[in-house]
């Protein structure tokens, strides 16, 4: 059994594999793939700063990918993680690429990474409107959320923007996933930053020297592949690209076997002989299964 607390899931042994969730999420977004990956790697899935269960986001820090990566590096240092293979989804994908620029990644699997738009192209403002609308709707349905998410057809409809098959998510997980967005303490600031269309585009990609796989969900409604993959495919040195057929923006529930296989094939191909990490004695507390 792994070590779990609200700020991190950690289990397994072998090459260190860091999993980074997206904006307004938390580490349980990776729940479908954790068991299989932890059977092959030392899996470290932190909840990002300012998110539900994660460490506080520094009050004085701007909402930028660079500042988010600063906070993430501090968290990884506290966990005793040096370099690692890094897998990120959405905002987590952008942070994975930012870590690669800093030399912290042995390899990167970026699943529908954010930050691939261009300042002024309207995508940041579109995302601001999307997240603001989602938060308003979530607040409205919060009192009835448990009842709403008890029906598979309603889960599929409610989660359609982030995945194709929301009915595969357990009701309790669907409730937790939805409530996590309301508990994201930086949501308002991040939406304002998106609306201002500054600070959340990822640049200097030529600084990346580790292997990178860009994995694009075929039916991504939040970051459509046609608009959000091209710049990364052009600017990341030696990047590999593949489509994830039949999947939405958060693809771990849509096709768990495909996501595990995609990660495992790429990471195992770029495995190193570096020793595994070891957490500080008091870094994590044991909690629930």
Language-model region placement:
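Conserved HGGG/HGGXW glycine-rich cap/lid loop of the alpha/beta-hydrolase fold
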Residues: 6-56
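Conserved loop-alpha-helix segment in the C-terminal half of the alpha/beta-hydrolase fold
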Residues: 35, 207-247
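Residue in the alpha/beta-hydrolase core beta-strand immediately N-terminal to the catalytic nucleophile
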Residues: 47, 85, 107-109
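Conserved acidic catalytic loop of the alpha/beta-hydrolase fold
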Residues: 66-84
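Gly/Ala-rich beta-loop-alpha elbow adjacent to hydrolase catalytic centers
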Residues: 88, 92, 96
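Flexible "cap/lid" loop of the alpha/beta hydrolase fold
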Residues: 105-142
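Conserved alpha/beta-hydrolase catalytic His-Asp/Glu region
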Residues: 145-206
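Catalytic active-site module of serine/aspartate enzymes centered on a nucleophile-bearing elbow/loop
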Residues: 236-289
């Amino acid at each position: 059994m792994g070590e779990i607390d609200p700020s991190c899931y950690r289990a397994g042994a072998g090459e260190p594999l860091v999993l980074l969730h997206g904006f307004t999420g938390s580490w349980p977004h990776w729940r479908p793939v954790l068991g299989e990956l932890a059977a092959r790697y030392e899996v470290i899935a932190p909840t990002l700063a300012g998110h539900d269960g994660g460490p506080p986001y520094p009050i004085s820090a701007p909402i930028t990918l660079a500042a988010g990566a600063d906070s993430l590096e501090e968290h990884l240092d506290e966990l005793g993680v040096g370099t690692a293979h890094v897998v990120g989804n959405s905002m987590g994908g952008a942070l994975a690429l930012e870590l690669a620029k800093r030399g912290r990644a042995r390899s990167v699997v970026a699943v529908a990474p954010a930050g691939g738009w261009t300042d002024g192209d309207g995508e940041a403002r579109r995302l601001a409107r999307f997240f603001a609308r989602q938060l308003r709707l979530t607040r409205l349905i919060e009192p009835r959320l448990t009842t709403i998410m008890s029906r598979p057809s309603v889960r599929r409809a409610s989660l359609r923007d982030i995945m194709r098959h929301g009915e595969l998510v357990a009701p309790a997980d669907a409730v937790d996933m939805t409530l996590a967005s309301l508990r994201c303490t930086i949501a308002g600031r991040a939406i304002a930053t998106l609306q201002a269309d500054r600070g959340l585009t990822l640049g200097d990609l030529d600084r990346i020297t580790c292997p990178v796989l860009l994995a694009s969900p075929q039916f991504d409604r939040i970051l459509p592949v046609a608009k959000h993959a091209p710049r990364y495919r052009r600017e990341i040195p030696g990047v590999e690209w593949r489509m994830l057929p039949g999947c939405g923006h958060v693809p771990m529930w849509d096709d768990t076997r495909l996501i595990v296989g995609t990660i495992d094939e790429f990471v195992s191909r770029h495995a190193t002989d570096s020793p595994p990490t070891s957490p500080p004695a008091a870094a994590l507390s044991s909690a629930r299964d």
